[in-house]
Amino acid sequence: MDKKKNISMAVIRRLPKYHRYLYELLKNDVDRISSKELSEKIGFTASQIRQDLNCFGDFGQQGYGYNVSELHHQISNILGLNNPYNIIIIGAGNIGQALANYTRFSKLGFNVKAMFDTNPKLIGLKIREIEILDIDYLSSYLEKNNIDIGIICVPHDNAQKVANILVKNDIKGIWNFAPIDLSVPEDVVVENVHLSDSLLTLTCLINKTE
């Protein structure tokens, strides 16, 4: 959707929350919901919800609200979930293994094809049928397989080297769990997940209320 190019990052970051909540409504057989009801459940104002959704089209009907199934479907398309994605995880430590064990990824269309590590005790093992390969084979694996997203779960001093290999092999999406900001070309999208940042935000908010 070309229109997405002009959508603010703030709106984009709210979309997964809409998607997740609508999924829960579907599981509970809820057919429709108003922006006011969404507001009460999701924590955004009704006006904000309407503005966000209007960025992508006219999904609601006055006096009726939103068809939950249709809205969930449309947001899925906006998020790119109408296509499957092949993923690899680089780093088979605690974070990498936790991600490999997260079954919801496959339900969303994210298929973890392989993991990579340097630890000889891990190489050759499988997590949910996902084989852990020697990181020395990362480049050759990428040359032979169609991979969309690379997830980096290695220590910070190795993260940029891994990112360089991914970029060299035309990976356009990187989910980075290493505590370092990566340097990549403009056409490569990086989503950083610095776990300590979230925790420090929490401690700041705790102290703000005291």
Swiss-Prot record:
Binding positions for NAD(+) per the UniProt entry: 91-96
Location of the DNA-binding region in this protein: 17-56
Molecular function GO labels: DNA binding; DNA-binding transcription factor activity
Pfam family of the protein (one): Put_DNA-bind_N
Classification via SUPFAM superfamilies: NAD(P)-binding Rossmann-fold domains, Winged helix' DNA-binding domain
InterPro entries, A to Z: CoA-bd, NAD(P)-bd_dom_sf, Rex_DNA-bd_C_dom, Tscrpt_rep_Rex, WH-like_DNA-bd_sf, WH_DNA-bd_sf
GO cellular component: cytoplasm
Keywords: Cytoplasm, DNA-binding, NAD, Repressor, Transcription, Transcription regulation
Principal location: cytoplasm
HAMAP family: Rex
Record function comment: Modulates transcription in response to changes in cellular NADH/NAD(+) redox state.
UniProt subunit comment: Homodimer.
Protein's name according to its UniProt entry: Redox-sensing transcriptional repressor Rex
Organism: Clostridium botulinum (strain Hall / ATCC 3502 / NCTC 13319 / Type A)
Gene behind the chain: rex
